[in-house]
């Protein structure tokens, strides 16, 4: 789970700015459901969400004891997860938004923020979505980046 969690954190953290006027946006929102873990990072202009499924290729990745949400400081969470000794990770949120992260013999305590304070994302209708292969998207960006303004 650590590797999947770290990948998700790396993706979501790309949207987080250390210079923000909204303090909760220095954190990553973790939403756990029976389907999996959704990680959300935002700077109020750009938001990145990534999803880790509970099961992949018939293999259990995440065990969900109880669904819930919390916002944890992104940089601190990333450093902790990156340095965890084993791939097994347990994240427990207790009363008062106290969060305990365990892996092997290591245990870390963080104070989280209420996920309800995190800005809501606008809902996007399914008919406005499309898929594009990543290599094609990279090519399109590479061939058009010269036209991007370097100043606002």
Regions found by a protein language model. Give the residues of each.
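Structural preference for solvent-exposed beta-strand-turn elements
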Residues: 1-152
């Amino acid at each position: 789970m650590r590797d999947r969690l770290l990948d998700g954190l790396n993706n979501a953290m790309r949207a987080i700015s250390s210079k923000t006027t909204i303090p909760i946006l220095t954190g990553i929102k973790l939403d756990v459901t029976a389907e999996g873990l959704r990680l959300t990072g935002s700077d109020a202009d750009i938001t990145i969400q990534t999803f880790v499924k509970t099961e992949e290729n018939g293999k259990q990745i995440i065990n969900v004891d109880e669904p819930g949400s919390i916002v944890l400081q992104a940089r601190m969470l990333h450093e902790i997860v990156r340095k965890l000794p084993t791939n097994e990770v347990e994240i427990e949120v207790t009363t008062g938004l106290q969060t305990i992260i365990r892996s092997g013999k290591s245990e870390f305590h963080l104070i989280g923020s209420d996920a309800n304070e995190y800005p809501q994302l606008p809902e996007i209708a399914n008919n406005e979505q499309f898929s594009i292969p990543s290599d094609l998207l990279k090519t399109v960006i590479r061939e058009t980046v010269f036209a991007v303004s370097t100043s606002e």
